[in-house]
Amino acid sequence: MKFALSLIALILLALIVPFFLPGAGKQAGVDPNSNLPWQISVDGQGGSTVFGLQPGVSTLGDVRQKLGNEIEVAIIAEPSEIGLLEGYYAQMPLGFVLAKMVVTVDATNEAISAMRERALKARHMESTTRRITLHPDDLAAADRLPIRAISVIPTVNLDEATIVQRFGEPGERIVVSDKRTHLLYPKQGLDVVVDQDGKELLQYVAPQQFARLREPLLAAPVENSPR
């Protein structure tokens, strides 16, 4: 399965739990004006920094150090697929925005297959998707691997006008269904999925890796909602 589409599907499954009330992200010890989703810096050499992390450079261990040890690390896999190695935060204050977050680890298929063989247990999530718990030795090894992408779903619904106000005008819009549109910001390495029926999804990669997100969207057929 293509990276972008599989990432969206697996993340939406992981983030299906209802969200909290607006303003709940204003927690003690959290600067409400820093680490916000639209505070993205680029280095002019194909890299970017968001939430104090650099996709493609920062490791899973860096994520723990920066955002906390509450992260849950597992392999998320659909039937007949190797799966993705992911870290999941059920609740993460990003400035004044409360969100759920998934970081995708840049692990090879061979490494993930080996981790699956040593895994302690597996359980089903939604449908036939499986969540596979790593052996402690593999958890330690995973901390040394770089993260490929960061995905965030804010607590509140964001319409397109609000997104444009915060992030600016997108470089491109790709409509994938009657209800879902991707707002692409290639210079920032950002894809914002606007969903009229669900929560919005923000996906961050290094700008030099933006084709990982864009190309599968161009190849996918437009889905029409049932009437």
Identify the function of each model-found stretch.
Residues 2-23:
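Hydrophobic membrane-insertion alpha-helices, especially the h-region
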Residues 21, 25-33, 58-227:
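A cross-family detector of function-defining hotspots
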